[in-house]
Amino acid sequence: MKESQVYLERARSRQQHFLYSLIFREYIYGLAYSHNLNRSLFVENVGYDNKYSLLIVKRLITRMYQQNHLIISANDSNKNSFWGYNNNYYSQIISEGFSIVVEIPFFLQLSSSLEEAEIIKYYKNFRSIHSIFPFLEDKFTYLNYVSDIRIPYPIHLEILVQILRYWVKDAPFFHLLRLFLCNWNSFITTKNKKSISTFSKINPRFFLFLYNFYVCEYESIFVFLRNQSSHLPLKSFRVFFERIFFYAKREHLVKLFAKDFLYTLTLTFFKDPNIHYVRYQGKCILASKNAPFLMDKWKHYFIHLWQCFFDVWSQPRTININPLSEHSFKLLGYFSNVRLNRSVVRSQMLQNTFLIEIVIKKIDIIVPILPLIRSLAKAKFCNVLGQPISKPVWADSSDFDIIDRFLRISRNLSHYYKGSSKKKSLYRIKYILRLSCIKTLACKHKSTVRAFLKRSGSEEFLQEFFTEEEEILSLIFPRDSSTLERLSRNRIWYLDILFSNDLVHDE
């Protein structure tokens, strides 16, 4: 019990920061201004020198403290104005400031953790979204069961504020944060998903931080239980969840938690050293080598944690536990599954001969051709059947710019999908882009494709669509034709990919 309490207090003791005063520091909004794509956000009203000003932020905070302006309905948020600015404008400004300020203590903790673990030099590789695939290739071939879980969202923002108070000790800051959320109370109800979507679009950085913090909170509990399950004797979760009774303000939440979780459905620690957890975008994967009933225990743990701690509903029947060899899952724009390679080995012992069947598991990571064609069709590179079409909106650009745009898209997709087991789908996507580029240039010059290729030279035209991959590999490996040919067929994961391609959608 003491070890559990020490674990809970360790992270909390590092977060003795005072953030309230930073809200009134002009350089904080300068940082937000430099990170914002819309640079006109912090521009003063007509009559000023087009400089961002802290005055408009102070005006908004003053207004939020006025009782008659505390709550503003969503329907009137675009109509009401204050000194020439609407409420959406002020909300975006103050949310950018909140995002910058509240990220500071967590960034300091992350840097400290990386330095303690002596992995700061490798941090960039860990940030790569493709670093997950070598892990899957090394670990998942030894596992038997997998569960693909969608993380439930949205969550009530008041619960997030209460949890955030556990990590950062600054009452005035959270008082101001609550005022900001109350000013937009129509956007923080979980019943109105359209309002949540609107709120996230108006305040993308603030919304992203709240979501990441929510995921970090439930994962910290999960990681603690996972680490302790291998060397602790059987005991209940009650010791760990004592903090909920202290921080939960609503009485019905405490009663619900005590009744439905701690007593009737109390889970216990169990030894499962071969369980692996992977999170990506809004989903997570739980895989294990042991029997499925252990996976079922973790499944119910997640469900009751979300329902009782975060007060967000999750359906048990939406979380399925499947044999890994019979289940494929979507992961960062790839289709992934485990394929069984069966081979027969002849063994001879003295005068007896035996035929032994050997089953080798191999993970297959392939390019999903149909979702990619739908993305290309949505971007007007082809139709829904995958037939290339011209892109007239680019016809006003020069030939060099048109070719450069298509080449950049083709290279990015080739770079992103280089780890695929089968390259046939990738070659088809590159062919669609190549022919779409030719049709766009022919449309610009008011000519047919055949006449344009005849005039330009079909052999030399757009040859970079097929050579850029070999040129990149030749800079890394020896210029041996057999080596490059072998590497072009094998998987190569690039650990410099920090963002997914715009055409990649993990539905």
From Swiss-Prot:
Its main location: plastid. It comes from the Eukaryota. Pfam families: Intron_maturas2, MatK_N. One of its GO terms (molecular function) is RNA binding. Keywords: Chloroplast, mRNA processing, Plastid, RNA-binding, tRNA processing. GO terms for biological process: mRNA processing; RNA splicing; tRNA processing. InterPro entries: Domain_X, Maturase_MatK, Maturase_MatK_N. The keyword Manganese does not apply. One of its GO terms (cellular component) is chloroplast. It is found in: Plastid, Chloroplast. The keyword Lyase does not apply. Belongs to the intron maturase 2 family. MatK subfamily. Usually encoded in the trnK tRNA gene intron. Probably assists in splicing its own and other chloroplast group II introns. This is Maturase K. The gene is matK.
